[in-house]
Every structure is written in C-alpha cells, then in structure tokens.
C-alpha cells in the first residue's frame, strides 16, 4: 500500500489535478466525509488527511510514504529524513514582515537594533533577522497574528501573505516580503528504497504534470 499525506484546503484542491494527471483520483471528498483515510481509484494507494504542520512528521516516521507540504512547514520542521524531489508550484504565497501603518520599520531594523516579532514561523523569522544583523525577541503565536501589533504585543509579525487583504483590513502594512513559498512533494527516504518500483513512476508522473503546466 502507498500512503499519501495531504491536508485539507488549498493544498488538497491544488494537488488533485496533479494526481489526476498521474492517473490517481481520490474517491471521497474530505470536506464531506468524516474519514481520515480516503480511498483512491487504485487499490494499492490511499490518502491520509492530517494537519498541514504534521505532514512532514508523518512522512519522516513512515506514517505516510509521501506527502505534500509548504516550504514554510518544511523549513520549520527541519526536513530530516525527507527527500524533496519536486517543487509542485502550487499554493503559492510569500513570507513577509508586516507592521502597523505608523510603525517606522526601517529605523527598527537598523543593524544591531532589537525588535519584538510575533509569528508562527519562529525558525524562519529568527534566520531572517539574524541575516539582517538585528536582535529579535520572538513571540510564538498560532493564529490571529494581526492582533499582535495592534495590541502592542509585538512591533511586527512574520506571516504568510497571499493577497494582503487581511493585513489591510486590520490596518497593517506589508513592509518586507522576503521568501517565496510554494508546496513540495516530500518522500520518505526508506520508502523510496523499499517501494521504488511503485513510487518512482508516481513521482515521475507528478513531475511531468508540473512541467506540463509551465
């Protein structure tokens, strides 16, 4: 059995056409089903629905043979034990710094200065500000990032931005986009060796589908 780990939402929806190009169809809708293990049109393949942040862990430890995860999630996870053969170029967005509209960000990030930042992506934020020579006090949050600058909890946030409409609605401005994000196919390295005859054609078919989309 080949097990593919996916998360609900945008990544799931944008992965489906790539799977279809490889001859695979998920035969139940995760939005309508309470099942966490979904069948496909192939008797030897199933899909497990997990939280986006858990996809790399499932693949790393063999709970799934392969999965689809955002670059942001993979950096935060560390990527240990994972083969990342394909940038699927789906679920695209960017990692950015945002602040209140009246906050002087340029002065706050002069070399040697210190800034307080709220984020879910602590590894990414820490590296970004280290590269700028700025001391950063990180506050780990799991949601509603936009509140942090508005309540004085933090000077800035580091978060994923797609259209920027949520920032604008909360009177924040995007001051520094610094990383393009898309989703990757990740494969368990041991599974690639043990199930190579079944996994390699699947990986190649998905790669061909990505290339065909340009």
UniProtKB/Swiss-Prot annotation:
Instruction: Report the domain remarks.
Output: Lacks the C-terminal regulatory region which is replaced by HisZ.
* SUPFAM superfamilies, per database record: Periplasmic binding protein-like II
Q: Which UniProt keywords apply?
A: Amino-acid biosynthesis, ATP-binding, Cytoplasm, Glycosyltransferase, Histidine biosynthesis, Nucleotide-binding, Transferase
| Gene Ontology molecular function terms on file | ATP binding; ATP phosphoribosyltransferase activity
Q: What is its EC number?
A: 2.4.2.17
Looking up CDD domains in the UniProt record yields: PBP2_HisGs
Oligomeric state and partners?
A: Heteromultimer composed of HisG and HisZ subunits.
Query: Which cell locations does it reside in?
Result: Cytoplasm
Q: What reaction does this enzyme carry out catalytically?
A: 1-(5-phospho-beta-D-ribosyl)-ATP + diphosphate = 5-phospho-alpha-D-ribose 1-diphosphate + ATP
Record organism: Leptothrix cholodnii (strain ATCC 51168 / LMG 8142 / SP-6) (Leptothrix discophora (strain SP-6))
Q: What class of enzyme is it?
A: transferase
Q: Does the keyword Transferase apply?
A: yes
**GO terms of biological process kind:** L-histidine biosynthetic process
Name-wise, this protein is: ATP phosphoribosyltransferase
Q: What does this protein do?
A: Catalyzes the condensation of ATP and 5-phosphoribose 1-diphosphate to form N'-(5'-phosphoribosyl)-ATP (PR-ATP). Has a crucial role in the pathway because the rate of histidine biosynthesis seems to be controlled primarily by regulation of HisG enzymatic activity.
What family is reported?
Belongs to the ATP phosphoribosyltransferase family. Short subfamily.
Hey, which pathway is this one from?
Answer: Amino-acid biosynthesis; L-histidine biosynthesis; L-histidine from 5-phospho-alpha-D-ribose 1-diphosphate: step 1/9
**From which domain of life does this come?**
Bacteria
Task: Please give one Pfam family short name.
Answer: HisG
The record ties this protein, via InterPro entries, to: ATP_PRibTrfase_cat, ATP_PRibTrfase_CS, ATP_PRibTrfase_HisG, ATP_PRibTrfase_HisG_short
Q: Which GO terms describe its cellular component?
A: cytoplasm
């Amino acid at each position: 059995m080949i097990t593919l780990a996916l998360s609900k939402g945008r990544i799931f929806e944008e992965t489906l056409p790539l799977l279809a190009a490889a001859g695979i169809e998920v035969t139940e809708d995760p939005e309508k089903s309470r099942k966490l293990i979904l069948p496909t049109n192939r008797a030897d393949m199933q899909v497990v629905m997990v939280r986006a942040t858990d996809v790399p862990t499932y693949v790393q430890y063999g709970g799934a043979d392969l999965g689809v995860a955002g670059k942001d999630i993979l950096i935060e996870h560390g990527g240990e034990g994972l083969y990342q053969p394909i940038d699927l170029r789906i679920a695209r967005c960017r990692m950015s710094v945002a602040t209140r509209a009246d906050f002087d960000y340029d002065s706050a990030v002069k070399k040697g200065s210190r800034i307080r930042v709220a984020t879910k992506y602590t590894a990414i934020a820490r590296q970004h500000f280290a590269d700028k020579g700025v001391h950063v006090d990180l506050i780990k949050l799991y949601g509603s990032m936009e509140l942090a600058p508005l309540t004085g909890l933090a000077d800035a946030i580091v978060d994923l931005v797609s259209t920027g409409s949520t920032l604008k609605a909360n009177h924040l401005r995007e001051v520094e986009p610094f990383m393009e994000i898309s989703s990757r196919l990740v494969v368990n390295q041991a599974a690639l060796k043990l199930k190579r005859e079944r996994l390699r054609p699947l990986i190649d078919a998905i790669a061909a589908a990505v290339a065909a989309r340009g």
